[in-house]
Amino acid sequence: MNIISKEQTGGIQMGFKEGFFWGGATAANQYEGGWNEGGRGPALTDFTTGGSVKEPRKVTWIDKDGNAHATPQVHFDDALPEGGDHYACLDGYLYPNHEGTDFYHHYKEDIKLFAEMGFKVFRLSIAWSRIFPNGDDKEPNEEGLKFYDDIFDECHKYGIEPLVT
């Protein structure tokens, strides 16, 4: 399959050889949205605010006395800061991962666009918190499994191979 014709390049043949996987990739926590839908449980990224060059991202939480805090994000381990009781979403902060690009609600449109661009593969990650909402569940969340099954079916409808990482 040649993507660019010889006429377009002055006689030089360009393009990808047959079997080349042309596609794209996404990361569930940045892209999916639907952060509290379909039985999905919370992940640390759900309590991480937006940021910029001048304002670092922060993690928001409540201490044991009920006071709200927003501290700079240093790393992604699950340990709360000293005196912390639980992570929480606080008013006045933007949590960009809550919506991402709203793939959760628009995956059919997005996958159709991927097909129009000629994608043959779509690399995606799976949000563990959509499959095991509490992190220690004995059984997976069926609604979460169905969401990913529907994505795979939609990819196959357009001849796109899902590649899960």
What spans do the regions from the language model cover?
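Non-catalytic accessory regions flanking glycosidase/transglycosidase catalytic cores in CAZymes
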Residues: 2-164
